[in-house]
Amino acid sequence: MGKAQPLPILITGGGRRIGLALAWHFINQKQPVIVSYRTHYPAIDGLIKAGAQCIQADFSTNDGVMAFADEVLKSTHGLRAILHNASAWMAEKLGAPLADVLACMMQIHVNTPYLLNHALERLLRGHGHAASDIIHFTDYVVERGSDKHIAYAASKAALDNMTRSFARKLAPEVKVNSIAPSLILFNEHDDAEYRQQALNKSLMKTAPGEKEVIDLVDYLLTSCFVTGRSFPLDGGRHLR
């Protein structure tokens, strides 16, 4: 008998930056992937050509989240992992209704992973001890808070807390952990002054790039023991 096809890894927000890098990492390992995307960036066409299943999703409403879950349930009988990478960034600023800012941040960072974890739970179970994973991408601000992004920080803190709750609920079949990054890579339009200011916030004074995240994700996926933990990727920023 031939070797069984590996179960797919689901990556939310996989059309750009870290999500896209993770998708290509797994594709290059012959690991099937399912990617959600909100905006059809050119990179999505490359993923589709490489064999990834890419599903456009609107996580701004609970109905949109559940519609995406239904598409995943139709497409596979199981999942190797869910990587909750989809994110949004809103600040409290003049003219923006505060209730709308909070609702938006909670919707993408709390409602979406909460609903998907429940809706797709049966796809993660039944594959053996510690055979499946959920990884939440939180943020360094969970530890420090943020005076300019209060709703964002609060929503990521809620996601961090859900890591421990889902770890309790889904063990020992499913490991649930979170990754809390600070600066990993710059945007193309970031100028030299901003880049230097950002680098100076950490002890290591570098933006390590996607590989740092990929290596940690690989560690969590291959561990048979680690669950309910948050892993900072901040270059010692908490010591500055």
From Swiss-Prot:
- Gene name tied to this protein: folM
Family in the record: Belongs to the short-chain dehydrogenases/reductases (SDR) family. FolM subfamily.
Is NADP included in the keywords of this UniProt record? yes
Gene Ontology process terms (BP): one-carbon metabolic process
What EC number(s) does this enzyme carry?
1.5.1.50, 1.5.1.3
**Top-level taxon of the source organism:** Bacteria
The positions flagged as active site in the entry are Y152
Catalytic reaction equation(s): (6S)-5,6,7,8-tetrahydrofolate + NADP(+) = 7,8-dihydrofolate + NADPH + H(+); 7,8-dihydromonapterin + NADPH + H(+) = 5,6,7,8-tetrahydromonapterin + NADP(+)
Keywords in alphabetical order, please: NADP, One-carbon metabolism, Oxidoreductase
Q: What is this protein's record name? A: Dihydromonapterin reductase
- Could you tell me one molecular function GO term of this UniProt entry? dihydrofolate reductase activity
Function, as annotated, reads: Catalyzes the reduction of dihydromonapterin to tetrahydromonapterin. Also has lower activity with dihydrofolate.
Q: What is the lineage of its organism?
A: Bacteria, Pseudomonadati, Pseudomonadota, Gammaproteobacteria, Enterobacterales
Q: Give the signal sequence positions.
A: none
Q: Which InterPro entries match?
A: NAD(P)-bd_dom_sf, Sc_DH/Rdtase_CS, SDR_fam
Q: EC class of this enzyme?
A: oxidoreductase
